[in-house]
């Protein structure tokens, strides 16, 4: 992806990733900054935009540190790109070097800086590289907390049901600058079958911490989208 970032300095340090084990270990420290880019293609250019977003920016210090997820069901965006920036990010007034191949393919986009876990932890939870395989499915959610309920919503969104039968990968990101939401969550399922089984079991846990009823006690608004991954391919 052609980087949108080139001076404002943004530091990480306020988010966590939740381990995929059914009794999660202590959450790792949130040390890094990520750039979350939601975008929609102009009519007829969705495939071309996806291809453009999947090209690593060789000018970036970490050109391979990003994922591109593609909308399947839910919100109005076509793609979300989550780019790892390291422990801090800088924005300058200087225009990015070279042309942006995605610029004329976008109908709109939104950009938000968030804090999150290390790239190693993010990669593990999202099933990137190594022995990861199959056809993972993701649920990307954004939430804004009710005033005074930030801590409660954090707990709701980061609690994993220890009795859950489906193992998932989970990343929790906290807004630093940009969009109107407070938190973003990404849940990885190993297959559509796992996603279906988890959703079928959801009504039975609605009232528990992290369940449907619980989250709605603390969230002013939310948007959830089912997506697949187009970059990296493995």
Sequence positions of predicted segments:
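Short S/T/G/P-rich N-terminal loop/turn motif that feeds into the first structured element of a domain
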Residues: 20-234
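Bacterial N-terminal signal peptides
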Residues: 6-15
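Positively charged n-region of N-terminal signal peptides that target proteins for export
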Residues: 1-4
């Amino acid at each position: 992806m052609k980087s949108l970032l080139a001076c404002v300095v943004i530091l990480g340090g306020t988010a966590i990733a939740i381990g995929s084990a059914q009794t999660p270990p202590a959450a790792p420290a949130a040390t890094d900054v990520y750039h979350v880019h939601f975008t929609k293609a102009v009519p007829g250019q969705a495939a071309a935009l996806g291809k453009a977003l999947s090209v690593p920016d060789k000018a970036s210090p970490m050109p391979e540190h990003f994922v591109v997820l593609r909308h399947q069901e839910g919100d109005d965006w076509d793609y979300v790109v989550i780019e790892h920036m390291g422990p801090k990010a800088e924005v300058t007034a200087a225009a990015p070097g070279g042309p942006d191949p995605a610029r004329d393919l976008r109908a709109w986009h939104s950009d938000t800086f968030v804090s999150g876990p290390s790239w190693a932890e993010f990669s593990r939870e999202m099933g990137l590289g190594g022995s990861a395989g199959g056809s993972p499915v993701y649920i990307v959610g954004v939430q804004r907390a009710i005033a005074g309920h930030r801590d409660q919503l954090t707990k709701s969104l980061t609690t994993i049901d220890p009795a859950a039968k489906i193992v998932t990968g989970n990343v929790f990101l906290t807004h630093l600058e940009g969009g109107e939401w407070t938190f973003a969550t990404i849940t990885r399922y190993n297959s559509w079958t796992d996603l279906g089984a988890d959703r079928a079991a959801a009504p039975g846990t609605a009232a528990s911490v992290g369940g449907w009823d619980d989250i709605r006690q603390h969230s002013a608004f939310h948007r959830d989208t089912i997506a697949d991954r187009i970059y990296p391919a493995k």
